[in-house]
Amino acid sequence: LPLQDGFDNAGLQIGLTEAEATGALLCLDVTEAVLDEAIALGYNLVISHHPLIFKGYKSITGRDYVEHCIMKAIKNDIVIYSAHTNLDNAPGGVNFKIAEKIGLSNVRVLEAKENTLVKLVTFVPTAQAEDVRKALFAAGCGCIGNYDACSYNIEGEGTFCAQEGSHPFCGSIGELHTEKEVRIETVLPAYKKSEVIKALLSAHPYEEPAFDLYPLQNSWTQAGAGVIGELETPETELEFLKRIKKTLSLIHI
């Protein structure tokens, strides 16, 4: 899970990936009461925000509530999946939804995620450049802040000599060919690399497209920990806290 923090243990916690879901129960924390409810409802999937398992276990003996939950889940064939900091850090994730619910405007990430962006460079015949760009954008490339379809394009010439066994889009076997091409540069989240490459290979007319991937040190301002924003109208601290308690249906604050 590429957006989770290093300390986290999000993802599949208990169960088989090929299990067919009969129903899903959402919760903040996995407890025995949550598992009992899932069993009573006939649901075999529990999706929690906080992971049940954070540390490694050398034995499972039921000595604490976590081990009790592990044993109960396994005994009743319940799959447990947790989406924690990967959901917190996601663009438009948990923090953005809370900010929207409490009426914040001009919302932006408090601590942007680093080492999560990649630059893609590829070279495409001029006539097919637009089709390839569209395919890359559709696969998740080209988003910078509140802008999408971002790319940089330079015209130039590419050369190649097709060998026996190849099926060149242009040029002839055994002859050096020069083709007018466009160098396309764009950015993408690193976790979308596989689907972007698949889209590139599908849209590119060459049977052996040339492309480069470069890791970037730029922070991804759309993803990260926490958000900050402004209130539409000023409030005192007490007024704000009372409104938060009511809006989020909290018992304590």
In which residue ranges do the predicted regions lie?
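Hydrophobic structural segments
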Residues: L1-H252
